[in-house]
């Protein structure tokens, strides 16, 4: 029993050290990925946004989660991870495949998946053994509610072309705001 405990402790320490040696440079790595994702989102546009003005909607982006001056790096990484995960979930539905260019969607999935992998290693490095991502549950919950509103909107609009155009533009806006958050994190370092 004692041997199992010490083995478990040793594995945790070794895992933590291996994550720490990854040298997480989130702002540089993630910002580049966000820019590529923004380019792909822009290329997905199928109709003019002006033809969808009547469908505009305020999804109540959780701006305060991206504006807080006291934002800790671990909290920012957790929020960014949740945003990327929810974006991945939103765009990986059969309804998005029907409305958007599948080749661009595939590239977008690959980009989001890479960002999620980068963020997961950063979360482990920044949060470590001391803190828990659950400490930032309010911030993560705000992001989840934001994406629930987007999903509800798409459902209410029956996944129309205009609804997808409005959502595409909204996700572009949220990615732009996350790039600004990363710039602030970089300036704090």
Curated annotation (Swiss-Prot):
Gene: IFNA8
Coiled coil: none
Record's keyword annotation contains Disulfide bond: yes
One GO location term (cellular component): extracellular space
PROSITE patterns reported in the protein's UniProt record: INTERFERON_A_B_D
Source superkingdom: Eukaryota
SMART domains with a match to the protein in the record: IFabd
Protein name: Interferon alpha-8
Principal subcellular localization: secreted
Pfam families: Interferon
Disulfide bridges in this chain: 24-122, 52-162
A single BP term in Gene Ontology: natural killer cell activation involved in immune response
Span of the signal peptide: 1-23
Compartment(s) of residence: Secreted
GO molecular function annotations of the record: cytokine activity; cytokine receptor binding; type I interferon receptor binding
Family indicated by similarity: Belongs to the alpha/beta interferon family.
Keyword annotations from UniProtKB, A to Z: Antiviral defense, Cytokine, Disulfide bond, Secreted, Signal
Function noted in UniProt: Produced by macrophages, IFN-alpha have antiviral activities. Interferon stimulates the production of two enzymes: a protein kinase and an oligoadenylate synthetase.
InterPro entries documented for this protein: 4_helix_cytokine-like_core, Interferon_alpha/beta/delta
């Amino acid at each position: 029993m004692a041997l199992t405990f010490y083995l478990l402790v040793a594995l945790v320490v070794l895992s933590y050290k291996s994550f720490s040696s990854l040298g997480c440079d989130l702002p540089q790595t993630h910002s580049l990925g966000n820019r590529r994702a923004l380019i792909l989102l822009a290329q997905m546009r199928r109709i003019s946004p002006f033809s969808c003005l009547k469908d505009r909607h305020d999804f109540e982006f959780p701006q305060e989660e991206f504006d807080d001056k006291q934002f800790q790096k671990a909290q920012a990484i957790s929020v960014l991870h949740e945003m990327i995960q929810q974006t991945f979930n939103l765009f990986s539905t059969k309804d998005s495949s029907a409305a958007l260019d599948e080749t661009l969607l595939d590239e977008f999935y690959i980009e989001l998946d890479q960002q999620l992998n980068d963020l997961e290693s950063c979360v482990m490095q920044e949060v470590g053994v001391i803190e828990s991502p659950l400490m930032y549950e309010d911030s993560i919950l705000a992001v989840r509610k934001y994406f629930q509103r987007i999903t509800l909107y798409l459902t209410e609009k029956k996944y129309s072309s205009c609804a997808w155009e409005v959502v595409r533009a909204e996700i572009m806006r949220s990615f732009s705001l996350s790039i600004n958050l990363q710039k602030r994190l970089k300036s704090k370092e």
